[in-house]
From Swiss-Prot:
CDD domains: PurM. The gene is purM. Its EC number is 6.3.3.1. The keyword Membrane does not apply. It is found in: Cytoplasm. This is Phosphoribosylformylglycinamidine cyclo-ligase.
Length: 347
């Protein structure tokens, strides 16, 4: 090729036509997520959203996260339809902990070469997650960056904004007291955390990922199960019961996430026999010879969201959560802390 040859963006590795085709695939997916407050459609330089008028003193709550190395399994297994829901769940469940209703979500998809079908599958999962959370997929960015990512790989980031009435924002550190009850909502699996260890165990064990593992589900099905989104169910419960604190059980497991919402003078004492541990965690512990404490410091071990309520409200909270379709367990209690003991114990 001589210096006089005309170059195009496509010659440099960026396919504008593919990007345009993806936008057309995305538009109907995003449209399904529209809700009250969205002003305008996809394609503008920015997105407008009007805070619902029912809020007297609205406080905006924001969250951002990725999917971590679960993406590597998505590449290896060629399964791209669930990681989008994972992406949404990571942020909307985080802001839910503060009592926030999710309003809108934006995503960032980066790759070396854009594969429209793969990207559309990912965004389809994002749209499904937004529908489950009741928030609008209001915009996003698709970045095709030649030379930055290996062929067939991509990275994801997501951003959620929600709102809570100022007087109803949940602050566990200010309201949780000894005697309160700890409830646990079931997870759908490992969610989106601990996947570097998941992958290491798979690398060591070399299982048949397509063999039946849990009932009719294969191991691939189980490890790629999308993160459960708790938003609508918990918001409905908050209308009937006072929730004193919540913890989204992500990286760090129960042992490192529950203390984030506890007053310094309290301990959450959890009973591991109080909830059923999904087969995946027992398999990983056995195949990886993982210590029990490490399991609870890395994985959710079957509990995706922890809710703390007053003892007098525990039965009502459990009944309402069950009515909303959640599997909920009474997994422990809050007690006074002795000295500098750990703030969360799994016994």
């Amino acid at each position: 090729m001589t210096q006089n040859t005309s170059l195009s963006y496509r010659d440099a590795g960026v396919d504008i036509d593919a990007g345009d085709a993806l936008v057309e695939r995305i538009k109907p997916l995003a449209k399904k997520t529209l809700r009250e407050g969205v002003l305008g459609g996809i394609g503008g330089f920015g997105a407008l959203f009007e805070v619902p008028k029912r809020y007297k003193e609205p406080v905006l709550v924001s969250g951002t996260d990725g999917v971590g190395t679960k993406l590597r399994l998505a590449f290896d297994l060629n399964r791209h339809d669930t990681v989008g829901q994972d992406l949404v769940a990571m942020s909307v469940n985080d802001i839910l902990v503060l009592g926030a209703e999710s309003l809108f979500f934006l995503d960032y998809f980066a790759c070396g070469k854009l594969d429209v079908d793969t990207a559309a599958a990912v965004v389809g999962g994002i749209a499904k997650g937004c529908e489950l959370a009741g928030c609008a997929l209001i915009g996003g960015e698709t970045a095709e960056m030649p030379g930055m990512y290996p062929a067939g790989e991509y990275d994801l980031a997501g951003f959620a904004v929600g709102v809570v009435e100022k007087s109803k924002a949940i602050d566990g550190k200010a309201s949780i007291t000894p005697g309160d009850v700890v409830l646990g909502l079931a997870s759908s699996g490992a969610h989106s955390n601990g996947y570097s260890l998941v992958r290491k165990i798979i690398e060591r064990s070399k299982p048949d990922m397509n063999a039946k593992f849990d009932g009719e589900r294969t191991l691939a099905d189980v490890v790629m199960a999308p993160t459960r989104i708790y938003v609508k169910q918990v918001l409905a419960t908050m209308q009937k019961v006072t929730i004193k604190g919540m913890a989204h059980i992500t990286g760090g497991g129960l042992l490192e996430n529950v203390p984030r919402v506890l007053p310094e003078n309290t301990v959450a004492e959890l009973e591991k026999a109080a909830w059923p541990r999904p087969k995946l965690f027992d398999w990983m512990q056995a195949e990886g010879n993982v210590a029990e404490n490490e399991m609870h410091r890395v994985f959710n071990c079957g509990i995706g969201l922890v809710i703390v309520v007053a003892a007098a409200d525990a039965d009502a909270a459990m009944a309402e959560l069950k009515a909303q379709g959640e599997a909920v367990y009474r997994i422990g209690k809050i007690r006074a802390r002795s000295g500098d003991e750990a703030q969360t114990l799994v016994v």
